């Protein structure tokens, strides 16, 4: 079911990543293995140059507290797997079909963007004054 949700999220998340955040490269389903360690990223987006930023999107059908921990772990391990991106600002986005208001608040407090599905399209669901936390 996970890849169905990821497939559902990709078109609208790609639009958000390119139009709102200026990402040039958007890669779904990135899997990396190094020295016996593995990292799986639902969507990796980045741009070089002046922005020099990367976004990692974790897609969930039903977001839970563990979803926050999982996204944090991916962000913390990212530079070991992608040393070529070590100087980029790095942000996380949790995209979910089902998400409680309480969990949404926790995700925002962690400095992650929240994306939710609305009319079969994922949209960012963040307050106007939201400040993302770089990792």
What does each of the following model-derived ranges do?
Residues 1-32:
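Acidic-basic catalytic patches of nuclease active cores, encompassing PD-(D/E)XK
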Residues 13, 41-47, 52-65, 71-76:
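Conserved catalytic cores of phosphodiester-cleaving nucleases, focusing on short active-site segments
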Residues 16-23, 77, 81, 110:
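Conserved, well-folded catalytic cores of nucleic-acid-processing
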Residues 20, 47-50, 79-86:
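Alpha-helix termini
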Residues 22-50:
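Active-site metal-binding core of divalent-cation-utilizing nuclease and nuclease-like domains
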Residues 54, 87-91:
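Residue-level recognition of the N-termini of beta-strands and the immediately preceding loop/turn
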Residues 67-83, 92-98, 102:
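Short, charged, amphipathic alpha-helix that recurs within catalytic cores of restriction-modification
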Residues 90-135:
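Domain-level recognition of nuclease-like catalytic cores that cleave nucleotide substrates
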């Amino acid at each position: 079911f996970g890849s169905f949700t990821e497939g559902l999220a990709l078109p609208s998340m790609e639009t958000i990543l390119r139009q709102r955040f200026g990402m040039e490269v958007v890669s779904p389903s990135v899997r990396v293995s190094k020295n016996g360690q593995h990292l799986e990223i639902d969507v990796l987006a980045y741009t070089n140059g002046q922005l020099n930023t990367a976004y990692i999107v974790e897609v969930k059908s039903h977001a839970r507290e563990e979803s926050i921990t999982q996204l944090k772990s991916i962000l913390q391990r990212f530079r070991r797997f992608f040393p070529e991106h070590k100087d980029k600002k790095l942000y996380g986005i949790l995209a979910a079909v089902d998400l409680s208001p309480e969990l949404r608040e926790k995700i925002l407090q962690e400095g992650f963007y929240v994306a939710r599905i609305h009319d079969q399209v994922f949209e960012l669901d963040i307050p106007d004054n939201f400040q993302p936390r770089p990792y």
